[in-house]
Amino acid sequence: MVAQNNQQNKDETKGIKSYYCSKIEELEIKVNEKAQDLRRLEAQRNELNNRVRMLKEELQLLTNPGSHVAEVVKLMGKNKVLVKVNPEGKFVVDIDPTVDIAKLTPSTRAALKHESYTLHRILPNKIDPLVSLMKVEKIPDSTYDMVGGLDKQIKEIKEVIELPIKHPELFESLGIAQPKGVLLYGPPGTGKTLLARAVAHHTDCTFIRVSGSELVQKYIGEGSRMVRELFIMAREHAPSIIFMDEIDSIGSSRGESGSGGGDSEVQRTMLELLNQLDGFESTKNIKVLMCTNRIDILDPALLRPGRIDRKIEFPNPGDAGRLDILKIHSRKMNLTRGINLKKISDKMNGASGAELKAVCTEAGMYALRERRVHVSQEDFEMAVSKVMKKDSEQNMSINKLWK
């Protein structure tokens, strides 16, 4: 009887123990769930607090009065600076301790507090978007191997553009100033722009291309401002090459008397260009490359040494040059055997490089028209006759016009 009671007590104890163990496990699971919920809610609280803080900061910025934009004129001691605010005038203001005084150079844009006029921030230079678009992001893929018949011109442009950028110590050892600008002149289609792209490829520097007509603006002062911002951008991205194509559109000779407001604005743009050419040092790794077909109408002030240090002529190619250009442009063409490029070159006496390229393209068009995949000698001869023929309609007599 006693043994039976002991067994019954053991069973009851075991049952109670298992019951409490199961309850403890359930409570532990609930505690873990509550702890996870608590951590999630804490994370949400932190996120909301951060958002509230950001909104408060944004609200504070929105409620603060705006800053004045000023231009630094010069430093006036350790903690003072003379600035120019348009249209109010010039002021001597304090400098905030957080501002690096070494960066406060003349013509630097800065922000002044609305009430105290304390200089508290340095602003980036203001560049016209049209000027920023002149900067070529992708380096041109043209190389010197793609230029034919211009060995002398390549050598001269290497000496004044590529050599000072890559090896400035050579000029310092000789004690001579680096050339600033180069003028490429010659008939149309002789490879001036092509050689400029090749120079940009081999120097591996910032290439800024601008046409002279882009600097002729409608409103007074716009062209001069674009020229100033163009050179500012060139200084910021040095070493750089400024390539000005068709410079005769703004660099023509000045007459004794102005012939109109448009000509006066063009002359103001050219005067600003002359000022910028005189203003920057030749050691700043900024080279100016100008290109024109009409050197005879350029102003002598633009052509003088110190602004344009070298003038490189690009004549029409000679016999050997024409053959080299034909070989370059026909290098990737699918030609039949026995093509005599020398014979084709002899038929194009006086042709420019652009006309030689047009002959290769036109020969391919003749083969394409006849559904062939090879270009023959006859295709080249027909292309020469088409490209080099004279426009007889310009020399028609009056009798022929009235037939």
UniProtKB/Swiss-Prot annotation:
Domain of life: Eukaryota
Primary localization class, coarse: cytoplasm
Subcellular locations according to the entry: Cytoplasm; Nucleus
Molecular-function GO terms, alphabetical: ATP binding; ATP hydrolysis activity; proteasome-activating activity
The keyword ATP-binding appears for this protein: yes
InterPro entries: 26S_Proteasome_ATPase, AAA+_ATPase, AAA_lid_3, ATPase_AAA_core, ATPase_AAA_CS, NA-bd_OB-fold, P-loop_NTPase, Prot_ATP_ID_OB_2nd
Keywords tagged on the record: ATP-binding, Cytoplasm, Nucleotide-binding, Nucleus, Proteasome
An annotated GO BP: proteolysis
Binding site residues for ATP: 186-193
GO cellular component, one term: nucleus
Similarity comment text for this entry: Belongs to the AAA ATPase family.
Job description of the protein: The 26S proteasome is involved in the ATP-dependent degradation of ubiquitinated proteins. The regulatory (or ATPase) complex confers ATP dependency and substrate specificity to the 26S complex.
Name this protein carries in UniProt: 26S proteasome regulatory subunit 8
Highest classification ranks of the organism: Eukaryota, Amoebozoa, Evosea, Eumycetozoa, Dictyostelia
Gene this protein is translated from: psmC5
